[in-house]
């Protein structure tokens, strides 16, 4: 009788211990409030700390931020504010209304990392839905085989996918291509192409702007976590979405690169009495791009810091 009681006690203790282990984080963070855009995490010492949210849920409920940028949802807005250390509030629900202005300081059309990652998430979701398990008498299709099928369908015979071929592949899925950040449809088409280029850059190991099958496989590998790249300028690093100005032109940090408008500045748009020749302006933009070497060298450090 006592042996039976001892066995039951051991089972009960094991079950209680098993239930407590996964709840340890929730217990530590139970009374911790981190605020919008942040979440509670547990340090190596077992203490609670607040960090920027690692990944927001992908539900689509666009909001316009006070910075004039459209976000997929409230969480993405507050996460961006946390990562950039800036104060961003919800201006109104829905996409930001495009300002019909002739002002040359308007921001260039760019693919932000959030846009790139959202396109990638939708592609992976679509491809995973096509997986067919092996049956009793039939062979199914695994993830690699599905990617191989699409790769061969859009490859022109050189065993690589360039940006136009990759774009044709993306356009096979209505959900994937429906990334709408701008009110103007032409800008959204441009955004789609820019995000395809950003996806190619993720796994283009030899920098030829084409993907071999292995690079294509890495790009859309569900377990691959794209790094968050920053832009460098004058010994400083800037988060995705940061902006700077060159005369009447605006430059935006997008996926680790500075992207600038190309407006011709007249006397009314220039600041103060400063004048710059086209050569000086071109040189400044080249200076922005030159600093990307520094950003690439510190890529791993920056990723860890985030």
Swiss-Prot record:
One of its GO terms (molecular function) is calcium ion binding. InterPro entries: EF-hand-dom_pair, EF-hand_FSTL1, EF_hand_dom, Fol_N, Follistatin/Osteonectin_EGF, Kazal_dom, Kazal_dom_sf, Prot_Inhib_GrowthFact_Antg. This is Follistatin-related protein 1. The gene is Fstl1. Homodimer. Interacts with SCN10A. Interacts with DIP2A; DIP2A may act as a cell surface receptor for FSTL1. Interacts with BMP4. Interacts with CD14; this interaction promotes TL4-mediated signaling cascade. Residues 1-18 form the signal peptide. Gene3D superfamilies: 3.30.60.30, EF-hand (1.10.238.10). Its main location: secreted. During central nervous system development, strongly expressed in the telencephalon, diencephalon, brainstem, limbic system and spinal cord. Widely expressed in all organs. One of its GO terms (cellular component) is extracellular space. The modification Phosphoserine is found at residue 163. Residues 142-176, 191-226 form the EF-hand domain. Disruption phenotype: Deletion mice die at birth from respiratory distress and show multiple defects in lung development. In addition, skeletal development is strongly impaired. GO terms for biological process: endothelial cell differentiation; endothelial cell migration; hematopoietic stem cell homeostasis; negative regulation of apoptotic process. Glycans are attached at residues 142, 173, 178. PANTHER family: FOLLISTATIN-RELATED (PTHR10913), FOLLISTATIN-RELATED PROTEIN 1 (PTHR10913:SF13). Residues 231-285 form the VWFC domain. Secreted glycoprotein that is involved in various physiological processes, such as angiogenesis, regulation of the immune response, cell proliferation and differentiation. Plays a role in the development of the central nervous system, skeletal system, lungs, and ureter. Promotes endothelial cell survival, migration and differentiation into network structures in an AKT-dependent manner. Also promotes survival of cardiac myocytes. Initiates various signaling cascades by activating different receptors on the cell surface such as DIP2A, TLR4 or BMP receptors. It comes from the Eukaryota. It comes from Mus musculus (Mouse). Keywords: Disulfide bond, Glycoprotein, Heparin-binding, Phosphoprotein, Repeat, Secreted, Signal. Residues 46-98 form the Kazal-like domain. Disulfide bonds join 29-40, 34-50, 52-82, 56-75, 64-96. Residues 28-51 form the Follistatin-like domain. It is found in: Secreted. It holds the Pfam family Kazal_2.
């Amino acid at each position: 009788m006592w042996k039976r009681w001892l066995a039951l006690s051991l089972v009960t203790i094991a079950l209680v211990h098993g239930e407590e282990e996964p709840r340890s984080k929730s217990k530590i963070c139970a009374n911790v409030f981190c605020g919008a855009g942040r979440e509670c995490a547990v340090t190596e010492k077992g203490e609670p700390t607040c960090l920027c949210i690692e990944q927001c849920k992908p539900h689509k409920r666009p909001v316009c931020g006070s910075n004039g940028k459209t976000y997929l949802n409230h969480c993405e807005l507050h996460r961006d504010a946390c990562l950039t250390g800036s104060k961003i509030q919800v201006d109104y629900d829905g996409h930001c209304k495009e300002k019909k202005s002739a002002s040359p300081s308007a921001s260039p059309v760019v693919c932000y990392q959030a846009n790139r990652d959202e396109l990638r998430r939708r592609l992976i979701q679509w491809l995973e839905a096509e997986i067919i398990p092996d049956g009793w008498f039939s062979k199914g299709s695994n993830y690699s085989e599905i990617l191989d099928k699409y790769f061969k369908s859009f490859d022109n015979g050189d065993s690589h996918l360039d940006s136009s071929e990759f774009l044709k592949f993306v356009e096979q899925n209505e959900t994937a291509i429906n990334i709408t950040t701008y009110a103007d449809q032409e800008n959204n088409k441009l955004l789609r192409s820019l995000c395809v280029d950003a996806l190619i850059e993720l796994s283009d190991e030899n920098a030829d702007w084409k993907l071999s099958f292995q690079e294509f496989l890495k790009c859309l590998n569900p377990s691959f976590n794209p790094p968050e790249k920053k832009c460098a300028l004058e010994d400083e690093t800037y988060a995705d979405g940061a902006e700077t100005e060159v005369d009447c032109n605006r430059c935006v940090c997008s996926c680790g690169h500075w992207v600038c408008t190309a407006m011709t500045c007249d006397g009314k748009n220039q600041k103060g009495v400063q004048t710059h020749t086209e050569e000086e302006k071109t040189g400044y933009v080249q200076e922005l791009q030159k600093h990307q070497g520094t950003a690439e060298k510190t890529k791993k450090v920056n990723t860890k810091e985030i």
